[in-house]
Amino acid sequence: MFKRHGGELLVLLSHPGGPFWKNRDVGAWTIPKGELEIDEEPAAAARREFEDEMGFSPGKLLSPLGEITQKGGKRVIAFAVEGEFDVASLRSNTFEMEWPPRSGRKKTFPEVDQAQWMTIAQARAKILPSQIELLQRLVDLTS
């Protein structure tokens, strides 16, 4: 999701929840994303994942930003939508994992623990390095 504020392009990024990401900032932020369901169209998956992770449906026509491959080999098909989102209203889905490791105890964590509007320069500094290309594609799309 992106918006313009005072003539400047802002992008909405999310920070992953859970203990692995707790104290990480630079290189940890990401676009809201997730897995395709069987026979699901990429744009439908993008809407569903945005709603799951942010608690809000973007609802508008999505503009394709193309595909990238992340460091671990995960393929990401990205879309952009212009809109408004109050980061204080973030309501992410959750996941469960054993924590601490080998403790036998399960703990529930939000998939996304925070969201933030950032300038493109701020986003370039904080986003997963493999997703920087998506920021440039957004700039190209909106100029």
Residue positions per predicted region:
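Charged phosphate-binding loop/patch that engages nucleotide di/tri-phosphates or the phosphate backbone
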Residues: 116, 120-143
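Active-site-adjacent beta-strand/loop module that shapes the phosphate/pyrophosphate-binding cleft
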Residues: 67-104, 116-118, 138-139
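Short connector loops at helix/strand junctions that flank enzyme active sites
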Residues: 26, 31, 59, 73-76
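Residues that scaffold the ATP/ADP-binding catalytic core of kinase and kinase-like folds
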Residues: 23, 39, 126
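N-terminal strand-loop-strand
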Residues: 1-30, 79
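Non-DNA-binding regulatory cores of transcription-related proteins
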Residues: 107-113
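The catalytic Nudix box helix
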Residues: 31-65, 119
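Short, charged/polar surface micro-motifs in flexible loops or helix N-caps
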Residues: 6-7, 18-21, 37-38, 72-73, ...
